[in-house]
């Protein structure tokens, strides 16, 4: 047989082999998509606010939630990840916002462990940009979409995705953890907001020995902020020796311009010795600047917050006005989101797991990921999830 004929036959065989491989990959994706459930399961019960808290209760809560989180309290079994290569879309509302970036990195790490890829779409910090990013993600036909964007603002593309059997996994996409049938979220990953507020209240009650005079700052345009405000202020209001002085409604967009006169007004009304709580540490850079300008004492005015951006870690570490904050996990949330995708692909409900709340104070600010200004539990969560997904039993 001529050499050219041999080459032609060899090339034809390679082509048939390549086409067969593509067909097999396509079949694997089709099977996975056919089994995938995008429709959410029923919502979990709403978190319960602890309305009363003695000083002893508060001190016990603070002691427990400032400990290292070495114990894995998450799932130990669950569905294995399907074989094959899949692409997940990560729709970030704003890649200049640190939590969105860190959650995305967690998604990428979890996906990489399975040989999957992640395509990130950036909303550029606007509602219209995030909607466009979501539509682009949907057009890419991913196996699933993970997003920390407000699900209320994305209802059309979410409904379109669910209709196409593409599950939507939220990270902070709505107020409460678990599935959200109302919003079309197969799962929403977020810390227990009642425990976040309760932990702030516990710190204030414990450290004041039940004598705190407290002001709470909130942006009432957000439902989750209102819920966290209630979970923070209720135990303080019910503490017999404490007093809720005022709840200040401060729109986040106006905080820079309005904070200085607001703080001056609070000091005129309540003097120079009080606590302040909030579910949004973003206020506190402006609050601290206004307090310094007024000559306030760090010994008399103390700030307790939540979310714990790098500025909060820095203030707590250096001994600024902020003395404590409740952070939310960074990369763990990304792994939880990938685990929810694995559950959706198997057609089963997401794992009933909420990472326990952690409280950072000066004594532990550099633990549990704190050296990098983020909360990364030391419970080897990545190892535990990978054992479940791969069906292995590696020591963690």
Regions found by a protein language model. Give the residues of each.
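N-terminal secretory signal peptides that target proteins for export/translocation
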Residues: 1-13
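Extracytoplasmic "Venus flytrap"
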Residues: 38-77, 85-106, 110, 114, ...
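Flexible loop/hinge segments that line or gate small-molecule binding clefts
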Residues: 48-51, 152, 156-195, 213, ...
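Hydrophobic alpha-helical
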Residues: 147-163, 232, 251-315
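Sec/Tat signal peptide C-region and signal peptidase I cleavage site
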Residues: 29-34
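Hinge/cleft segment of the Venus flytrap/periplasmic-binding protein
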Residues: 36-86, 333-396
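Hinge/beta->alpha junction and helix N-cap segments in small-molecule ligand-binding domains
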Residues: 67, 91-104, 120-129, 172-173, ...
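An alpha-beta-alpha
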Residues: 88, 92-93, 107-109, 195-249, ...
């Amino acid at each position: 047989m001529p050499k050219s004929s041999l080459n032609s036959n060899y090339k034809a065989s390679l082509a048939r082999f390549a086409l067969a491989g593509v067909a097999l990959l396509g079949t694997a994706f089709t099977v996975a998509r056919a089994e995938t459930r995008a429709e959410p399961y029923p919502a979990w019960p709403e978190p319960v606010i602890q309305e009363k808290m003695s000083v002893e209760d508060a001190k016990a809560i603070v002691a427990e939630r400032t400990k290292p989180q070495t114990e894995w309290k998450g799932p130990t079994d669950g569905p294995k990840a399907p074989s094959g290569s899949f692409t997940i879309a990560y729709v970030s509302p704003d890649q200049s916002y640190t939590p969105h970036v860190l959650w995305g990195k967690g998604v990428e790490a979890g996906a990489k462990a399975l040989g999957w890829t992640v395509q990130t779409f950036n909303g550029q910090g606007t509602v219209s940009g995030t909607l466009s990013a979501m539509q682009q993600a949907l057009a890419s036909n991913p196996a699933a979409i993970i997003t920390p964007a407000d699900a209320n603002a994305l209802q059309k593309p979410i409904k379109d995705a669910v209709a196409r059997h593409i599950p939507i996994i939220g990270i902070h996409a709505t107020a409460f953890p678990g599935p959200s049938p109302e919003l079309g979220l197969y799962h929403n990953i977020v810390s227990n907001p009642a425990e976040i507020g309760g932990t702030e209240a516990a710190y204030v009650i414990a450290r004041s020995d039940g004598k705190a005079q407290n002001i709470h700052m909130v942006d009432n345009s957000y439902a989750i902020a209102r819920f966290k405000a209630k979970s923070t202020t209720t135990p303080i209001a019910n503490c017999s020796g404490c007093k809720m002085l005022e709840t200040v409604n401060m729109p986040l967009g106006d905080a820079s311009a309005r904070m200085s006169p607001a703080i001056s007004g609070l000091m005129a009304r309540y003097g120079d010795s009080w606590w302040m709580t909030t579910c949004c540490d973003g206020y506190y850079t402006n609050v601290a600047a206004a307090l310094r300008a007024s000559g306030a004492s760090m010994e008399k005015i103390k700030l307790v917050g939540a979310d714990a951006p790098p500025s909060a870690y820095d203030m707590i570490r250096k001994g600024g006005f902020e003395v404590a904050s409740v952070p939310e996990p960074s990369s763990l949330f990304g792994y939880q989101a990938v685990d929810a995708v694995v559950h959706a692909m198997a057609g089963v409900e997401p794992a009933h797991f909420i990472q326990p709340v952690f409280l950072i104070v000066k004594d532990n600010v550099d633990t549990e990921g704190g050296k990098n200004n983020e909360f990364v539990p030391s419970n080897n969560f990545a190892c535990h999830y990978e054992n479940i997904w791969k069906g292995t039993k590696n020591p963690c």
